[in-house]
Amino acid sequence: MRKRLILATAALVSSPVLAATGQSATASGQAQAVIITPIIAVALNDLDFGSLTSSRTASGSVTVGAEGAVNYAGGAAPACGGACAGVAPARFLVSGEAGRSYTVSTPATITASGTLIGGGSAPALAIDALTLHLDSHGGAVTSIGQLDDKGEDRIAVGGRLNVPAGTAPAHYRATLTIMVTYS
């Protein structure tokens, strides 16, 4: 009987069920997030090429600089002088988290659709060579801005309206979309 008891004890001691488990450990870390003010842009003024005339024989263009300068070329000419022409760059207000930098982008070209004076559709005109002036950079040519201590910056956008020879009198409109993103 004693031999059976020793064999039974030996069988229990060597059983995998009774074997010691391996060592384990745990660790804890942190999860975190910082929520900041969303960045937004609001249009304040439209890009306005003013009132102009078009030559019957020569194509032309009018360029409005982001800083406000205007240049007529080729067959495009102002319809009148001074404020009557109504030329101005577009202006946008950007707001978000104070002190943050951001990037602004514009399309390469936008298309202005027209309505003929007296009705009907006019041929589309291209607006290209869009330029930027960011108040936070004092007029330097850049697409990276900096929000001030109030979380604001202002952007001016200029561009060039291309006018084919013989363009009929019409009212033109285009949508100018800018995109601002935090850097």
Describe each model-derived feature in a short phrase:
Residues 20-114, 144-183:
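N-terminal small/polar-rich segments of proteins
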